[in-house]
């Protein structure tokens, strides 16, 4: 039922949703869902307007955890560690600094600006600015001794490697 990206290096998959909705409706249950619209993909000029440090939000199911009673995923907040509009390490990627755990692979990472300002810094009360910036797929192994050893190519988001003790 899952369809995977043809490039094995790109950790994306999708499942046709229509059959699930039809099944729920046949059971006399109306499913609630929200979709990510194409209007949330930032244009090139929007990416150029961003700063290196931006607030980001990731929504997902780390280690399969979620609120089963209310059917709600986990929300993690952090910030960008590199500029989202500049290729990191020569790849069309950027790094984030946020709590990301094994099993978060495939979680969407959003730019979230809820400061009541538009991107031109004009005051707009009650208006949020949300854009999808990417999909989490890498993490670093952090040891209790305070060392970051290697970047793992599976799961989670990409963060800087630092070989220093705490």
Question: Where are the regions that the model predicts?
Answer:
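Serine endopeptidase catalytic core focused on the charge-relay Asp
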Residues: 1-102, 106, 111-114, 121, ...
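C-terminal binding/interaction regions
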Residues: 134, 143, 155
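Short active-site-adjacent structural elements
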Residues: 141-147
């Amino acid at each position: 039922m899952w369809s995977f990206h043809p490039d094995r290096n790109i950790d994306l998959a999708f499942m046709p949703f229509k059959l699930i909705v039809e099944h729920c409706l046949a059971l006399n249950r109306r499913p609630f869902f929200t979709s990510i619209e194409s209007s949330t993909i930032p244009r090139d000029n929007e990416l150029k307007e961003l700063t290196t440090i931006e607030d980001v939000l990731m929504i997902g199911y780390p280690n399969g955890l979620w609120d089963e009673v209310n059917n709600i995923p986990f929300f993690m907040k952090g910030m960008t560690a590199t500029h989202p509009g500049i290729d990191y390490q020569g790849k069309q990627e950027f790094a984030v600094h946020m709590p990301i755990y094994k099993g978060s692979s495939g979680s969407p990472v959003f730019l979230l600006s809820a400061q009541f300002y538009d991107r031109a810094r004009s005051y707009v009360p009650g208006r949020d600015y949300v854009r999808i910036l990417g999909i989490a797929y890498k993490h670093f192994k952090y040891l209790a001794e305070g060392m970051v050893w290697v970047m793992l190519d599976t799961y989670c988001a990409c963060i800087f490697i630092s070989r220093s003790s705490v």
